[in-house]
Amino acid sequence: CTFCDYHTDTSLQPFEVNRPVLEQVTGRYGMLDVINSGSAMELDEDTVAMIADIVRKKAIHTLWFEAHYMYRNRLSDFSARFEPAVVKFRCGVESFEPTLRNRWNKGISSDVTPQEIARYFQGVCLLCCTEGDSRERILNDIEIARRHFEYFSVNVFCRNTTFVRRDETLVH
């Protein structure tokens, strides 16, 4: 995505990064949210296998992942690896405003509606407070997310190495 530079710190050995984090999962609440700033289908095989093992050993009943919209037809097959847990997915749409999604290079066609996204995903991630953003757009996206999704997050843009700039007025 245009606003993202997270890919610059990826590890050549992701399981070595992920394993110590996953070893901390207790299962106390029966829910696990795997946040990786990417798509679950792109996790390495060792990490996926460890998550599946944790689901069974720790009695996880609900498992959340993030996935790009392009994986929408693979969600069911991927979910089967984690039975008996209910697997839910969120999509980083960032905005329901097609012009903004295109400018951010989200790879989600401008004709894709919130209803279409909700056919596949139970949650969405929204992004706000970039230069050119507006309070009205943010509130509209929140209202759409409330109507169509069981879960949504509103993420405030943080300065990074990309050309996208933060709107400090909106932040405050």
Could you describe each region identified by the protein language model?
Residues 17-24, 141-143:
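A short, acidic, amphipathic alpha-helical segment used as a generic capping/interface helix at domain edges
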Residues 55-59, 80-84, 118-119, 146-148:
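Short, conserved loop/helix-junction motifs that constitute active-site signature segments
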Residues 44-46, 101-105, 134-136, 164-167:
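Short, solvent-exposed loop/turn segments at secondary-structure boundaries
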Residues 6-20, 28-45, 55-73, 86-111, ...:
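Core AdoMet radical
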Residues 43-52, 72-82, 135-138:
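Distinct, well-ordered alpha-helical segments
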Residues 110-165, 172:
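Conserved C-terminal portion of the radical SAM core fold
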Residues 16, 42, 165-172:
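Long, ordered, amphipathic alpha-helical scaffolds
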Residues 1-4:
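Short cysteine clusters
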